[in-house]
Structure formats: structure tokens, C-alpha cells
Amino acid sequence: MEMRQPAVAGQFYPLHCENLEKELTRCFEGLEIREREVFGAVCPHAGYIYSGKVAAHVYATLPEADTYVLFGPNHTGYGSPVSLSRETWKTPLGTIDVDLELADGFLGSIVDTDELGHTYEHSIEVQLPFLQYRFGRDFKILPICMGMQDKDTAVEVGSLVADLVSESGKRAVIIASSDFTHYETAEHARETDSEVIDAILKLDVPGMYDSLYRRNASVCGYGPIAAMLSASQKLGGSRATLLEYANSGDVSGDMSAVVGYAAIIVE
């Protein structure tokens, strides 16, 4: 069996199972686990020390599902423009299988089966220990890495995912992995991010793209967010909530060049 090995264990999160569990416990500290009818979410993907607590706000609300669809941006430039992994994924907490039944539905579509896009990419990998911590082993994933993030591509991919999920009758939750503004002052990042987040909270994909262009925003996973929004709405999601917003300066103390992080759910 082909295995997608962890690329950033020991960098973005602890390498050893025991330390990783401790770090995840820290991230969830003070949060009540209260499952909500979540169709989709936006989660950050920085090192857990910086964005783990923000991500935990989302994971504390997620319901159990058969499959978690994970959209992540392609930071490496490797692989297909939109790539789907079929390999089993390994983390320090164990292995997770891909939902091959759903994966088969992408044949002949804009989404290619391609492992190279995933081999070194961290954006999806860093979400998986959160899922394992919350739900153990009883779920599958559908990991889709997006190098092409234009609106038409994102909406097409999101719409296709919604159709496949509906036809399957499975319970699925769609997670978009994205950080927000990169390396601006905390004040500037908050201004830019609040405009982009406002559009997301209105479930307004064209409006989000307008904000990105107008503000020249460095949100890395805008395509995954748009794909998640279009899929979530097609599956019945009708309102979005911002659960938490923070930036790297809140941890490092350096407010001169921060990365913004948001936890958003669509119900």
C-alpha cells in the first residue's frame, strides 16, 4: 500500500505521538467541545504554536462525519493544477485512509489524481492530527490540493464535491485550509482580513475575490475557501460564523510583520 509520509512533523507540529497529543491538548484548553451542524470551515495551517489554538476553535465544533474533504493551497508548485491524493496518509497519531469511493467520482474532471502535489505540501497535513485527536480513526479524508485558485476553478471543484457527496449519501464536512494576510503590520493585516472575512461571512465568493484584488491581499488559500463555500452552500449551508481571529504576533510579540489566522464555520 502506498503511504503519504508526514512532510512537516517535527517542524509545524511535534514529531512524537505523546508530544503531539500534549500540544493538541494545549490547543483545546479552555474550549468546550460542542458539535454543531457544520457543513464547511476555514482553518489556519501555520505551526501549532502560532495557529493551533485558532484551528481548535473550528475542530471543537465539528460533528462526526464519514469523510472530511480537505482543500488546501499548493505552496510548493509541484504536481497538477488541482490534485487529489489516493494514498493512505500517515501522521504521528496513526494512518488515515482516503475515501476512494468519492475519489473515483473525479475521473475525467478538472481534478487529477496526483500524489506529487501533496508530497511536500503542509496545508492539508497539519489539519489531520486535529481530526485524529477529535475523532480517533473512524473517518476517511478526501485531500485536494489547489495550485489553480481562480474563481471559476474553485467553484467548479466545490460544486463537483457537493454533487459527489450528495450522490453518495455520506455525511461530509469540508475544510478549507488557509492563513490570511502575510507579513504586514498587525493593524494592516486586521484591516485587510476583516474585509475578506466579511465577504466569506456573507458566503459571497465573487465579493471575496473582489476584496482580495482590491486589497492585494496575501491570503494563501483563497481558492480552497471559495471551493468550500460553493460546496457548503450546495449541501445546505446558509450562514457563516467567525469563531476566532488572531495573528502570529499574539504569540511572538512582533506586531510589525504578522500572519493572520481565522476560524470560520458554515452551518
UniProtKB/Swiss-Prot annotation:
Domain of life where this protein originates: Archaea
Pfam families linked: Memo
InterPro entries noted in UniProt: MEMO1_fam
Family in the record: Belongs to the MEMO1 family.
Record protein name field: MEMO1 family protein MA_0601
Species name: Methanosarcina acetivorans (strain ATCC 35395 / DSM 2834 / JCM 12185 / C2A)
Lineage of producing organism: Archaea, Methanobacteriati, Methanobacteriota, Stenosarchaea group, Methanomicrobia
